């Protein structure tokens, strides 16, 4: 089974990206940190997720890099012009310097916005973990996005969310040859048809109100568990990069 970047359908026409598998529609604006990314690559449009971590920085996956990126904050229905929405262009995309597009190691990227987002009930940053904070197997977390409901399914207009259980490292070590426990998180119960999928790339894995992971990759059949970039392993890089710019 080939690995499936949770943006691969993203890197085909945007209409092929869809929504969360086995989840439900989120309460509008209950996740004010969520960002919808419209990406341009070779003249075509693709999509990813992301999340606001500072008034002018969004965190996402490095494999969501494109020639230009537009960020929509404060959205629930991405096809409507909701009064809460703020559309901001990206001034600078900064993928991790050791990102490997073959193994997806260090799949993390900061996006500096061209202007500061205006804080509101629908737009506010999410907390990042403490440096020594670690998620443990059995912990319940959640992921949200405008990604895919299933293989070859249409895209979601409204934000979807799903609860996921953190799995043991052994689950993903056995499932993915390039899984790295120090910098990645394994999440999604293999007995349940619930997970993030194509189009959800770059969105946050949220545990107890804290962004602990970033949607990275999984299998192309939509089965679980999937792999998430472990944010706590990159805190010094995140802080150093935001200070630099």
Curated annotation (Swiss-Prot):
Region forming the signal peptide: 1-17
Family matches, as SMART domains: Tryp_SPc
Stretches assigned to the Peptidase S1 domain: 20-243
CDD domains: Tryp_SPc
Main location: secreted
Tissue/organ expression: Mucosal mast cells.
MF terms (GO), sorted A to Z: serine-type endopeptidase activity
Pfam families with a match to the protein in the record: Trypsin
This protein's UniProt keywords: Disulfide bond, Hydrolase, Protease, Secreted, Serine protease, Signal, Zymogen
Annotated Gene Ontology cellular component terms: cytoplasm; extracellular region; intracellular membrane-bounded organelle
EC number: 3.4.21.-
Protein family: Belongs to the peptidase S1 family. Granzyme subfamily.
Protein name in the entry: Mast cell protease 1A
């Amino acid at each position: 089974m080939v690995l499936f970047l949770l943006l691969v359908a993203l890197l085909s026409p945007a209409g092929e990206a869809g929504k969360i598998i086995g989840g439900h529609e989120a309460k509008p604006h209950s996740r004010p940190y969520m960002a919808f990314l419209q990406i341009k690559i070779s003249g075509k449009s693709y999509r990813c997720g992301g999340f606001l971590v500072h008034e002018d920085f969004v965190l996402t996956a490095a494999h969501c890099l494109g020639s230009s990126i537009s960020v929509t904050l404060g959205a629930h229905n991405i096809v409507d012009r909701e009064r809460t929405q703020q559309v901001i262009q990206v001034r600078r995309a900064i993928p991790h310097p050791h990102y490997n597009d073959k193994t997806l190691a260090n799949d993390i990227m900061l996006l500096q916005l061209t202007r500061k987002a205006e804080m509101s009930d629908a737009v506010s940053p999410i907390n990042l973990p403490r440096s020594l904070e670690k998620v443990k197997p059995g912990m319940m977390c959640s992921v949200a996005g405008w990604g895919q409901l299933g293989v070859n399914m249409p895209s979601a207009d409204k934000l979807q969310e799903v609860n996921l259980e953190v799995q043991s490292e052994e689950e993903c070590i056995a499932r993915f040859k390039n899984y790295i426990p120090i910098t990645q998180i394994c999440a999604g119960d293999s007995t349940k048809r619930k997970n993030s999928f194509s189009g959800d790339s770059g969105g946050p894995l949220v545990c107890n109100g804290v962004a602990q992971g970033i949607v990275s990759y999984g299998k192309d059949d939509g089965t679980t568990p999937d792999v998430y970039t472990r944010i706590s392993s990159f805190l010094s890089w995140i802080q150093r990069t935001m200070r630099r710019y």
